[in-house]
């Protein structure tokens, strides 16, 4: 099955998303990581599309979505939640499951808490955090800021693919075809003819102007829905002590949290192989 491509007006911006599956099926929102695009979710969305309507947005400033006019104010979780609320409204979504990689998991957490957008409270049924947690390791955040804030430019797409293979090695196993797709859906050409990753470098202002944006225990503690945290076994962003604390707070104290380590991955599992599909399937279908 091939996805449809949608352009939707959310919070004053044109937001692109790919949509898989039947319109009447239960909805899954699959939201990508910080410097990525919704097309990262293609393999998982294709797998889920026989049973779910899967929506994979490009965050503002990424992929085919518009870039922020005021980066300081709009590259932040509260604005991303506003976009998500408009996405629900524009697409006629009442209830949804949420799968979020890294930043996408944080957006799902703040949406599910209802603190930023009260109209979303109670409308996210299950939350899957793919290598995301309410506190992230400082050293890993510095690493991510370093490569995301100064994206390189190359003469050829093949050079950019080699860069992606290096920087995203912690994703785990990808086939050559998947690396090629990751590259081709993550590339834009600069005015000088070189190619660079497909996002607005100004999005890292989130860390400068909102340095505690990803410290979201107050949102996590308010969750009363099932949560699955997939931690890459070699992740430097989500530490074991953080997942241990998650079990003592919020949904962890209510018997609603599962933590599973994904072998062979760091930050973050690509959600592209049968073993990872099985984890997602089991969580979404668990009643």
What are these regions (language model features)?
Residues 13-67:
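Conserved HGGG/HGGXW glycine-rich cap/lid loop of the alpha/beta-hydrolase fold
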Residues 224-265:
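Conserved loop-alpha-helix segment in the C-terminal half of the alpha/beta-hydrolase fold
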Residues 162-228:
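Alpha/beta-hydrolase
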Residues 265-274:
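Catalytic histidine-centered segment of alpha/beta-hydrolase-like enzymes
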Residues 94-138:
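Conserved hydrolase catalytic core segment
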Residues 40-42, 65-72, 139-140, 240-241, ...:
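Conserved catalytic-core motifs of eukaryotic protein kinase domains, centered on the activation segment
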Residues 1-29, 50-52, 93-94, 258, ...:
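Alpha/beta-hydrolase fold catalytic core
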Residues 13, 43, 56-99, 118-120:
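Active-site loop/oxyanion-hole signature of alpha/beta-hydrolase fold enzymes
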